[in-house]
Amino acid sequence: MVKWRNNMNINELKKEFIKIYGEGSMRNFFSPGRVNLIGEHIDYNGGHVFPCALNFGTLGCVRKRKDNKVNLASTNIPLKVSINLEDIKYEKKHGWGNYPKGVIKEIIDKGYKVGGMDILISGNIPNGSGLSSSASLELLIAIMINNIFNDGKLDKVELIKLSQKAENDFVGLNCGIMDQFAVAMGKKDMAILLDCNTLEYKYAPVDLGNYVITIMNTNKRRELSDSKYNERRLECEKALKLINKEKKINYLCELSLEEFESLKYLIKDNRVLNRATHVVYENERVKRAYYLLSKRNLKEFGKLLAESHFSLRDLYEVTGKELDAIVGEALNVSGCIGARMIGAGFGGCAIALVEKSKLDLFKKKVSNNYNKIIGYKPGFYTSEIGEGTYEI
């Protein structure tokens, strides 16, 4: 489990690197975590999402080697992994190391240059929190390889796709493209309105005025592979097949609300209908959120966050008692104008939009009430909106 630290020091990491790998020059990189403001479980349904990069994430130091060996070490986890570039395969015992291995393999398979490296990473994104520790690590490695071996000339969107492919095909976890996109393409004080179908995107300035986005960690770990994530994807595919009897589309999110309402009679299974309803309406909420933030209408934006959570709870059924408790308690506190779960669900984190002057009281009340309901306390992190992966 990653130990939470509010600030990572690159100089400390450099010293650790020298202890492990010896004296010499090195290059240093940072890759953020991400939070999706709204638009949950629709990235794999061709929908719009609205993520931003955080100002905490994963630091990495790297040095080129003269051979084909890659050494991976972390300050967070004792496990060290060494691989040969000519023989990269998934090995369960390599744990976290499979994420960098997957990215390296995908880049090699594309015919791009990769050489031997000594790498040390240090992250402060809690594992299983839903803040994209895996995408942060994947893009850290991808941008390292781009800058060190390819003069920074590789297309960033291609690196995003290769990182997603590494997680899907090499590690074997289903994920949409949003996490990698937000981590790589984030800009300070901007959210990204991303069409996951076409990868068209535009930036929206996020001016929260007297409010702050607070991340609330239920402290219940979320395991993607153990969750019902894959089951939900299959249910959405069922809905899509049924809709396709009348209207040929590639993704549910291609439907407008009016089109969906006129075609939903094709879906007889109530559970499958609920999943599809969430997807289509959530996609509309994202577009409205973009508009509301551009007008700085924070109160209405906050209401959309709550609507999103209730839909994820009642229609998509991916919240669970911990997320429902923390969001419910947040919405009951004066000064909070919106809250919702983020990530895949079944644990992990939620976000709340809270008045800055009431933040300390908010955290105290939510923490105490959550503890009464669940039996242990949550964690709180406040982050600014930061830059995508970069070389320091």
UniProtKB/Swiss-Prot annotation:
Sequence positions that bind Mg(2+): 134, 167
Pfam families per UniProt: GalKase_gal_bdg, GHMP_kinases_C, GHMP_kinases_N
Gene3D superfamilies hit by this protein: 3.30.230.10, GHMP kinase, C-terminal domain
Binding site residues for substrate: 40-43, 229
Residues at the site labelled Transition state stabilizer: 34
Subcellular location: Cytoplasm
NCBIfam families on file: gal_kin (TIGR00131), PRK05322.1 (NF003705)
Keyword vocabulary terms for this entry: ATP-binding, Carbohydrate metabolism, Cytoplasm, Galactose metabolism, Kinase, Magnesium, Metal-binding, Nucleotide-binding, Transferase
A GO-annotated cellular component: cytosol
TM region(s), chain numbering: none
Family: Belongs to the GHMP kinase family. GalK subfamily.
Residues binding ATP: 74, 128-134
Protein's UniProt name: Galactokinase
Keyword presence, Magnesium: yes
Gene Ontology biological process: galactose metabolic process
Superkingdom, natural source: Bacteria
Record's catalysed reaction(s): alpha-D-galactose + ATP = alpha-D-galactose 1-phosphate + ADP + H(+)
Pathway named in the protein's UniProt entry: Carbohydrate metabolism; galactose metabolism
Species assigned in the record: Clostridium tetani (strain Massachusetts / E88)
Chief location: cytoplasm
Entry's EC annotation: 2.7.1.6
Catalytic residues (UniProt): 179
GO MF annotation: an example: magnesium ion binding
Function summary: Catalyzes the transfer of the gamma-phosphate of ATP to D-galactose to form alpha-D-galactose-1-phosphate (Gal-1-P).
